[in-house]
């Protein structure tokens, strides 16, 4: 009886914490329990004493201010010795940007209503630009010719400039398009599906660069001077940040600007003496307006309090004296314009600082905030484009290509690759749109953008690798027919730029997330830094109650598998519950790690990476549920969403369990694992049955497939590489009844097909029209699986003219 009563009391205590009820309710309930247990039930004296001590001690802490102050002062002193010392640039990076729905994950409180109300819809003007100007640009592009010429054609360059592709995000009052983040993302994605080189060329001026920096931070004079020319393409911008000694650690740049006065003509001008050595700068070889990050120094104190020393952003023209620019890099054989900028003793006026002298020393925060916008849009769109191409072409190829008298998509090994392509593509598109929605709401989602950039580019890598595996020889022979090699070569570039993925996962995502998303940590950090005990006293007790609240949620959800959690009415209701259940566990685990490890988390990168994985996968699961919610009337969308969220739950739980196993305190790690995940790894990788259904779905028309076809470039011309595959697939789908009618057709070889079909016509098994139709379909199938070949002489001359189209078709 005593044990049962104790369990009831424990459930009551957890309910008070879970529901955040008034502590007085717990105190009254505890008093009633202790009286009954002690005087009426006959509780054993030893546990009785322990429970009395715990309850009395807790009440004293809750009610006696002097005790609370003593505890908080003790914690204040301990934290003062353990918090990491941050440099100015680290502090600016951690404080830059806004939070988005990742905060719901971090705090264990997903808001389903808020999620359901998020919308990103193109305006009529934006849709028209995607359908017309962007389509026309894609018509003009030929990735094979671009690779041979190592540049876009003059015609393409002029079209990009004249039609405002460099001014997509510049406000209309300065001659730009003023498009939304969704339009920007859709435009980049469509171009990327045709040419990665062209996509990079368009996306960089609209991402981290002079246009974005001027729009947000420029003076009115700077905006009026530069933005109209940028919008019209009269100026081509670039931004020079990285250096030989400063890549991911961009805060350690050595390029410097010394504040000094110099006599120019009859006037003494306050200016900067700039020396720089930059590399990996996209558009640098052709740029006419150069944005530049330098370490500003003021040894003579000439700034006089207006601005300060530190990283500063400048804007200088190409023809500035002593500036060396024009040399090119060739990143992964992708011939977009990328190169070096050097110079020494370059004098520029102080007015070249973006935003004027007052912004001296504030460049890093400007860069991080603008980077969070670009990382939300450009690179996620590239990753989504790659995985979408993988989805459409690999599904089609698996239906078109036959081996061992069977469509290769029927082999289980191929099905496994297909399902992963489909599920990860669904995740990439869903995550892209959810993060873009934050920018549409004028937020600068630094954490969400880092997660989206990391995982969309990683998913691009996985799906393209899978596509290469399935296509096999069809993918490895380069030429104008090959639609995968360019994506494959471009993947390392997207993985590396705007924050190398290794650094983002191990340092940035959870590092920024803990400061931005936790309701108390940032304020506690500053209270300790400023020696503000009074502020800390108020914060720490709110934090402790928050910690206990999350503990109760994590414990209850873990032991009930989340079955009691409220969730929206949906065919995927159980997935909503699982997401909430895992977010409850994550919130307490993240908080515990911050409390126990403190500043050591900055050094324990692999633990930080696992916490980053947990938050990221749950964020992507949330994105997938939202994406499904908008299309839930279609059964094929459910299959895609089911695979995507199942994958995310598996990876998130795996990351958290791995975190517990590798926790520095083994006993505490074990205890946490038992409390939060008493049944171990209950979330599993998508099963074979789901893989099979999804793979088979990829090889035929479905609602999701039809939707993503609208997001990439298709010309309607069966001579174009991707259209060639799509044309053959649609013929196979539309005439599937004929293949079912002639069941042994798959055993026919191309060379003997006409003869064998003629025999069947003679027997009355086929009509002549049906025979002609089948031959037309098989001719398209033959054409789709051909690869490029080149004459020996053209290879020798490096002209690389494919002769495949001139070769006879065995069905002619």
What are these regions (language model features)?
Residues 6-14, 26-39, 46-205, 212-236, ...:
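Amphipathic, small/basic residue-rich leader segments at the start of a protein or domain
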Residues 120-135, 141-163, 214-263, 273, ...:
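Gly/Pro-rich turn-and-neighbor structural signature
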Residues 267-324:
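A short core secondary-structure module
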Residues 321-347:
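Flexible, small-/acidic-enriched active-site or ligand-binding loops
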Residues 342-375, 392-409, 550-573, 585-602:
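A glycine-rich, basic-preceded beta-loop-alpha segment at the flavin cofactor/substrate interface
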Residues 425-455, 464-476, 598, 620-653, ...:
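C-terminal helix-coil-helix/basic helical segment that borders enzyme active sites and/or dimer interfaces
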Residues 475-572, 667-758:
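Glycine-rich phosphate/cofactor-binding loops in nucleotide/flavin-utilizing enzymes
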Residues 575, 579-582, 605-621:
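C-terminal substrate/ligand-recognition segments
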């Amino acid at each position: 009886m005593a044990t049962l009563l104790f369990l009831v009391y424990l459930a009551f205590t957890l309910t008070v914490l879970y529901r955040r009820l008034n502590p007085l309710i717990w105190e009254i309930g505890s008093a009633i329990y202790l009286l009954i247990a002690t005087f009426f039930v006959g509780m054993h004296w030893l546990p009785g004493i322990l429970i009395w001590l715990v309850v009395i001690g807790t009440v004293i802490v809750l009610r006696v201010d002097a005790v609370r102050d003593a505890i908080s002062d003790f914690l204040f002193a301990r934290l003062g010795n353990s918090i990491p010392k941050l440099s100015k640039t680290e502090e600016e990076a951690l404080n830059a940007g806004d939070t988005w729905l990742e905060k719901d994950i971090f705090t264990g409180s997903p808001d389903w209503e808020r999620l359901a109300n998020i919308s990103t819809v193109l305006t009529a003007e934006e849709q028209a630009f995607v359908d017309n100007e962007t389509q026309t640009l894609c018509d003009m592009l030929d990735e094979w010719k671009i690779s041979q010429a190592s540049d876009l054609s003059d015609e393409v360059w002029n079209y990009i400039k004249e039609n405002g592709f460099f001014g997509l995000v510049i406000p209309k009052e300065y001659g730009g398009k003023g498009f939304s983040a969704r339009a920007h993302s859709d435009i980049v994605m469509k171009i990327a599906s045709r040419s990665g080189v062209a996509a990079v060329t368009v996306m960089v001026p609209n991402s981290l660069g002079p246009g974005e920096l001027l729009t947000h931070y420029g003076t009115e004079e700077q905006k009026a001077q530069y933005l109209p020319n940028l919008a019209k393409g009269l100026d081509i911008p670039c931004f020079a940040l990285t250096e030989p000694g400063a890549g991911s650690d961009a805060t350690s740049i050595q390029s410097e600007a010394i504040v000094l006065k110099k006599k120019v003509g009859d006037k003494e001008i306050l200016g900067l003496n700039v020396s720089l050595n930059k590399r990996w700068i996209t558009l640098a070889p052709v740029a006419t307006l150069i944005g530049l990050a330098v370490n500003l120094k003021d040894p003579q104190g000439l700034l006089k309090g207006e601005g300060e020393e530190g990283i500063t952003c400048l804007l200088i023209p190409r023809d500035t004296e002593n500036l060396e620019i024009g040399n090119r890099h060739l990143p992964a054989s992708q011939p977009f314009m990328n190169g070096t900028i050097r110079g020494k003793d370059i004098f520029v006026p102080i007015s070249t600082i973006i935003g004027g002298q007052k912004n001296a020393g504030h460049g890093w925060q400007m860069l991080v905030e603008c980077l969070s916008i670009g990382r939300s849009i450009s690179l996620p769109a590239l990753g989504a484009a790659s995985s979408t191409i993988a989805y459409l072409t690999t599904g089609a190829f698996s239906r078109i290509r036959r081996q061992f008298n069977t469509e290769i998509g029927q082999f289980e090994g191929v099905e496994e690759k297909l399902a992963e392509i489909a599920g990860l593509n669904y995740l990439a598109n869903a995550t892209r749109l959810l993060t873009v929605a934050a920018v549409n709401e004028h937020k600068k989602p630094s954490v969400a953008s880092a997660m989206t950039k990391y995982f969309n580019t990683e998913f691009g890598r996985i799906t393209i690798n899978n596509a290469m595996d399935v296509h096999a020889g069809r993918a490895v022979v380069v030429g104008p027919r090959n639609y995968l090699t360019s994506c494959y070569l471009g993947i390392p570039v997207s993985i590396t730029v705007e924050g190398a993925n290794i650094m983002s996962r191990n340092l940035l995502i959870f590092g920024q997330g803990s400061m931005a998303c936790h309701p108390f940590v940032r304020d506690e950090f500053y209270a300790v830094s400023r020696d503000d005990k009074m502020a800390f006293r108020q914060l720490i007790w709110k934090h402790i109650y928050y910690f206990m609240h999350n503990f109760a949620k994590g414990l209850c959800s873990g032991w009930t598998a989340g079955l009691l959690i409220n969730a929206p009415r949906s065919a995927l209701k159980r997935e909503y519950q699982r997401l909430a259940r895992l977010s409850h566990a994550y919130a307490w685990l993240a908080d515990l790690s911050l409390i126990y490890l403190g500043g050591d988390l900055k050094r324990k990168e692999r633990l930080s990476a696992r916490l980053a994985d947990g938050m990221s996968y749950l964020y992507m699961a949330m994105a997938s549920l939202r994406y499904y919610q908008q299309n839930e009337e279609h059964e094929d969308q459910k299959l895609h969403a089911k695979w995507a969220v199942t994958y995310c739950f598996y990876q998130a739980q795996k990351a958290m369990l791995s975190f517990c196993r590798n926790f520095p305190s083994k006993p505490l790690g074990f205890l946490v694992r038992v409390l939060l995940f008493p049944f171990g790894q209950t979330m599993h990788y998508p099963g074979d049955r789901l893989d099979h259904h999804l793979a088979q779905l990829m090889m035929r028309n479905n609602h999701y497939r039809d939707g993503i076809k609208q997001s990439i470039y298709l010309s309607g011309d069966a001579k174009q590489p991707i259209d060639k595959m799509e044309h053959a697939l649609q013929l196979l789908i539309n005439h599937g009844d004929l293949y079912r009618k002639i069941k042994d057709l798959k055993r026919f070889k191309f060379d003997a097909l006409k003869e064998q079909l003629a025999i069947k016509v003679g027997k009355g098994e086929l009509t002549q029209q049906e025979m002609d139709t089948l031959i037309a379909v098989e001719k398209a199938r033959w054409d789709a699986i051909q690869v490029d070949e080149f004459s020996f002489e053209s290879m020798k001359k490096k002209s690389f003219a494919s002769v495949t189209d001139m070769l006879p078709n065995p069905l002619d």
